């Protein structure tokens, strides 16, 4: 998806066994615990971003949800003219990835104030939080507006566990 490339979010996350060096300098690898690792990737300007551990101590029950899968979630809404992609961003070094679409469900208050509605999907590459799909009248563009949107009473709200495949 083009929005992922432009926002430098066209990377994947993978589970890799936790590794460490023991007291005698030998490399060790866990069979039970994993790290969630953002793959090395190349930005549009040619800069190579090295692999980065986003979270650690996860079990094999955790199923990472890729950024591309989140973008595909919005395709039906966009293809049917119900929404347009508005924002794609990451917070905390890619630990939270947020995609925002502006919906056609806008309205006007008495006095002429226009209220626009957005639908966003936030995936947490932290190993702890669920994917959140929510509607909001707050346009999410940074951590402050993201936090404000989480405090709203959402008309549409869903949670997706990382224990299941998001297909």
Regions found by a protein language model. Give the residues of each.
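Feature for intrinsically disordered/low-complexity regulatory segments and propeptides
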Residues: 1-73
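Intrinsic disorder/low-complexity polar-acidic segments
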Residues: 64, 68-167
């Amino acid at each position: 998806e083009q929005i992922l490339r432009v926002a430098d979010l066209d990377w994947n996350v993978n589970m890799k066994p936790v590794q460490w060096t023991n007291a005698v300098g030998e490399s060790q690898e866990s069979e039970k615990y994993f790290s969630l690792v953002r793959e090395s990737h190349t930005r549009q300007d040619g800069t190579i971003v090295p692999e980065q551990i986003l979270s650690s101590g996860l079990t094999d029950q955790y199923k990472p949800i890729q950024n591309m899968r989140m973008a595909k979630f919005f395709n039906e809404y966009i293809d049917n003219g119900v929404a347009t992609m508005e924002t794609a961003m990451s917070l905390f070094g890619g630990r939270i990835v947020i995609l925002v679409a502006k919906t056609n469900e806008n309205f006007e208050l008495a006095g002429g104030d226009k209220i626009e509605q957005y639908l966003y999907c936030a995936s947490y590459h932290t190993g702890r939080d669920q994917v959140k799909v929510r509607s909001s009248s707050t346009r999410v563009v940074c951590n402050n507006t993201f936090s404000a949107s989480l405090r709203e009473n959402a008309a549409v709200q869903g949670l997706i566990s990382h224990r299941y495949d998001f297909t």
